[in-house]
């Protein structure tokens, strides 16, 4: 990919994060930003030379902030920080999450408030651009004082330590550098702290989940519209006049999306043609999906502020003042990421209920569990169970992490955000809900093929159905079928964005009005 993203600490977007994290876009540091980094570094060098007392530069860390460090030990202090703080647990974060983390950290550092050397920032950028991905365990951060443990793991390979992925192989940090043609570095005063003291890990994980949630919201409208086709849904609940008198942006956008998707459909009905009202899971799609759209639009705004923010401590102002504060505290993102998880969970919840309506013969008027010979075959019976399991798990995961705090560091850090847990939970809820929505689409397509009278599909539902059928076949449920294979195909189709792109060629879909 030839696209190069200019990093100035001010203009990074969520789409830029995705381009770097998932599509191999490279980055360069803005020329003015380089000057700001160098000016900030000069102030740190002056502090060390003048033996001034500044937290994390000439003192210990956390509750050890009153321990003075001699100028000759300031470099060792920083390496010790990385070695001792790299205490994460669990499985490694996905490579796209780590690349997002590296990018966001660089963008924060180039604002010029952290006192780091330009050469050190460029070293982290070199790892990113050349595809060296540090091995970062997923657990171990309190989300204050920043994401210390996981970010320490990010820094280890820069020193020739730790582990990293390169070209799909997990290697020692030094071996990864050697294969990529990168020289290791030694940290100078304040640099270890500048690299690890911030909300970067929780923001990186949450940024990817936010982007994926936006795509899922559009997919959920497609799924809901396909269910409407199956059930001969009543279209009046989506009329614009109904929603302009309650002008919630997400609700308005959802109603418009459904109208666009169903335009020209021969399957939809009007009130009293078959029944007076549809159930809430169809009739209230704008209100339910729309609420989640509004929540996620808010989270996106918070993410784009955070990826262009300084979350270091202490910070060094342009005038040379050193300020110890709390910008590393993850609470401003912990609450939004809890909110994100709840919003996504609701999409999974309502989609699972529509799956039940599709497979329930009393509700769909189709063969039980969408199979031609129910009894001999169980059809989609256990598929609905699986969706219910995922929806139920989401409800547990939706308990907010940000309401919890355990004091740490001898009670110096006595109130923490647990924001990284919130971000990780939101990402897991996203995976579960995406599976449920994929299953709804699969079940709706199966149901459409079983309908005795199936008329022309809508402007948006037809390309959705057509592309889906190119990848996932109608299931006869004979002895040759293993349904998990088709379920996996369905999930893979919507995860790679090809499915949504095909629908959006036909109709405009949005999350805000």
Curated annotation (Swiss-Prot):
Pathway: Amino-acid degradation; L-histidine degradation into L-glutamate; N-formimidoyl-L-glutamate from L-histidine: step 1/3. Keywords: Cytoplasm, Histidine metabolism, Lyase. The gene is hutH. This is Histidine ammonia-lyase. PANTHER family: HISTIDINE AMMONIA-LYASE. Its EC number is 4.3.1.3. HAMAP family: His_ammonia_lyase. SUPFAM superfamilies: L-aspartase-like. It catalyses: L-histidine = trans-urocanate + NH4(+). InterPro entries: Aromatic_Lyase, Fumarase/histidase_N, HutH, L-Aspartase-like, Phe/His_NH3-lyase_AS. Contains an active site 4-methylidene-imidazol-5-one (MIO), which is formed autocatalytically by cyclization and dehydration of residues Ala-Ser-Gly. Belongs to the PAL/histidase family. One of its GO terms (biological process) is L-histidine catabolic process to glutamate and formate. Pfam families: Lyase_aromatic. It comes from Streptococcus sanguinis (strain SK36). There is a cross-link at residues 144-146 (5-imidazolinone (Ala-Gly)). It is an enzyme of class 4 (lyase). The modification 2,3-didehydroalanine (Ser) is found at residue 145. Signal peptide: none annotated. It is found in: Cytoplasm. GO terms for cellular component: cytoplasm. GO terms for molecular function: histidine ammonia-lyase activity.
């Amino acid at each position: 990919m030839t696209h190069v993203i200019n990093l100035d600490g001010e203009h990074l977007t969520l789409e830029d994060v995705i381009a770097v994290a998932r599509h191999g876009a490279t980055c360069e540091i803005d020329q003015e930003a380089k000057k700001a980094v160098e000016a900030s570094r000069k102030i740190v060098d002056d502090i060390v030379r003048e033996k001034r007392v500044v937290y994390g530069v000439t003192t210990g860390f956390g509750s050890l902030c009153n321990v003075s460090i001699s100028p000759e030990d300031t470099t060792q202090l920083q390496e010790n920080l990385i070695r001792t703080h790299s205490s994460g647990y669990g499985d490694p974060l996905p490579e796209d999450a780590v690349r997002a983390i590296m990018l966001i950290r660089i963008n924060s550092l180039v604002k010029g408030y952290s006192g780091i050397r330009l050469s050190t920032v460029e070293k982290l950028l070199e790892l990113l651009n050349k595809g060296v991905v540090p091995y970062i365990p997923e657990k171990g951060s309190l989300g204050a004082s920043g994401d210390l443990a996981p970010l320490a793991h990010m820094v280890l390979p820069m020193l020739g330590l730790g582990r990293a992925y390169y070209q799909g192989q997990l290697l020692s940090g030094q071996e990864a550098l050697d294969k990529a043609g990168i020289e290791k570095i030694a940290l100078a005063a304040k640099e270890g702290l500048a690299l690890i003291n911030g909300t970067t890990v929780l923001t990186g994980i949450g940024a990817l989940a936010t982007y994926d949630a936006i795509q899922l919201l559009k997919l959920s409208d497609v799924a809901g519209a396909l269910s409407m086709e199956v059930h001969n849904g009543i279209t009046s609940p989506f009329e614009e006049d109904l929603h302009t008198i309650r002008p919630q942006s997400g609700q308005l956008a959802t109603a418009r999306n459904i109208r666009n998707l169903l335009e020209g459909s021969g399957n939809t009905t009007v009130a009293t043609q078959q029944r007076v009202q549809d159930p809430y899971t169809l009739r209230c799609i704008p209100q339910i999906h729309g609420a989640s759209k509004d929540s996620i639009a808010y989270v996106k705004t918070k993410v784009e502020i955070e990826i262009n923010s300084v979350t270091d401590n202490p910070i060094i102002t342009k005038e040379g003042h050193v300020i110890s504060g709390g910008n590393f505290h993850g609470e401003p993102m912990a609450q939004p990421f809890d909110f994100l998880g709840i919003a996504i969970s609701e999409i999974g919840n309502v989609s699972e209920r529509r799956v039940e309506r599709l497979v329930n013969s009393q509700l769909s008027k189709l063969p039980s569990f969408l199979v031609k010979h129910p009894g001999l075959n169980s059809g989609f019976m256990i598929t609905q169970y699986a969706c219910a399991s995922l929806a139920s798990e989401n409800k547990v995961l939706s308990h907010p992490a940000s309401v919890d705090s355990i004091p740490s560091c001898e009670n110096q850090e006595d109130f923490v955000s647990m924001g990284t847990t919130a971000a990780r939970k939101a990402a897991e809820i996203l995976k579960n809900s995406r599976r449920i929505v994929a299953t709804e689409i699969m079940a709706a397509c199966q149901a459409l093929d079983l309908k005795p009278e199936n008329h022309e599909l809508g402007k948006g539902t037809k390309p959705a159905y057509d592309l889906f059928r190119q990848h996932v076949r109608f299931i006869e449920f004979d002895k040759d079928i293993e349904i998990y294979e088709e379920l996996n195909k369905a999930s893979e189709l919507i995860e790679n964005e090809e499915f949504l792109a095909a629908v959006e060629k036909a109709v405009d879909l949005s999350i805000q009005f």
